[in-house]
Amino acid sequence: MDNRSVQRRRTGDVRHLLLAAAFLTCNSQLLLVDANSWWSLGLTPIQRPEMYIIGAQPLCSQLSGLSQGQRKLCQLYQDHMTYIGDGAKTGIKECQYQFRQRRWNCSTVDNTSVFGRVMQIGSRETAFTYAISAAGVVNAISRACREGELSTCGCSRTARPRDLPRDWLWGGCGDNVYYGKRFAQEFVDAREREKNYPRGSREHARTLMNLHNNEAGRQAVYNLADVACKCHGVSGSCSLKTCWLQLADFRRVGEFLKEKYDSAAAMRIGRKGRLELLDKRFNPPTPEDLVYIDLSPDYCHRNETTGSLGTQGRFCNKTSEGMDGCELMCCGRGYDQFRVYKHERCHCKFHWCCYVKCKRCSTLVDQFVCK
């Protein structure tokens, strides 16, 4: 199959998305405060209403945190919403894993903003959160296409890689990363594209920052997807292989974006209304890099204004010199030490046939908590 025919098929896959995007652009409005977020879809299960029940509310009217444009996309693609929620949940969990040993640990709060007021600051942490959330949606939608869960997409139609050996078959049902990336762009970016802040304003800079980091998250999933193959043959001889495009494990995506977080570029709004480097001595960021416009707040102490939850009560590692160490995690305030019993399986033995029997052991361990 030549590249032209592949491109035509891809274009057909996303034509409905482009039409929806044009519809949303014509109905944009000024949004001053993002008190709610679509991330909240990851905190509560999404259940499609039973249409035959008298008085049942439409699905999209039940979902909080959606912007006007996202709600319209919800109406057009209701079967996608469960997977958008799954993607948000995946992103939140990965964020919490990657930052589990940092002062800011991606904690959620009990409202539809999900992460609280700290997201109103255009910091490195905010940049990572936007990127990993967008990546989660690409991941979930791409896999749902492959599994036949969505009405507007199916298996990947990516062209055969040129470096694939000739005697290997190409055509297994792969993850549709192309569709997942396109749909995630239309849905996740809808909120930002509805805004109409004055060009060059601080609010406009924040919108550009969000859009850039959303794209960086999508690019991470797209670029890390790779070829997977399965052997066929008598007695596992692997005389034939069938290959397809497969998503990378999401942990790899999280680790990749964490590296981008550590090297994120500090930006400011320029005279032409575009983001530019704060320090021109550095190379400009690529679409895969994260960008931020504000310094991170003090995460050591609880602060209602910035949304920082502080590190009081956080566990720390007494012997570590890293960010999880008690000296850094507790910000010099000191720590309390106490002993607890840790219960775990031990002395496991295999019995024929066929089960494993273990004993339960208790060990007294020291734990340290920041004051």
From Swiss-Prot:
It comes from the Eukaryota. It comes from Oryzias latipes (Japanese rice fish). Residues 1-28 form the signal peptide. A lipid is attached at S235 (O-palmitoleoyl serine). PANTHER family: PROTEIN WNT-5B, WNT RELATED. One of its GO terms (cellular component) is extracellular space. Coiled coil: none annotated. InterPro entries: Wnt (IPR005817), Wnt_C (IPR043158), Wnt_CS (IPR018161). One of its GO terms (molecular function) is frizzled binding. Palmitoleoylation is required for efficient binding to frizzled receptors. Depalmitoleoylation leads to Wnt signaling pathway inhibition. Glycans are attached at N105, N111, N303, N317. This is Protein Wnt-5b. Keywords: Developmental protein, Disulfide bond, Extracellular matrix, Glycoprotein, Lipoprotein, Secreted, Signal, Wnt signaling pathway. Disulfide bonds join C95-C106, C145-C153, C155-C173, C229-C243, C231-C238, C300-C331, C316-C326, C330-C370, C346-C361, C348-C358, C353-C354. Belongs to the Wnt family.
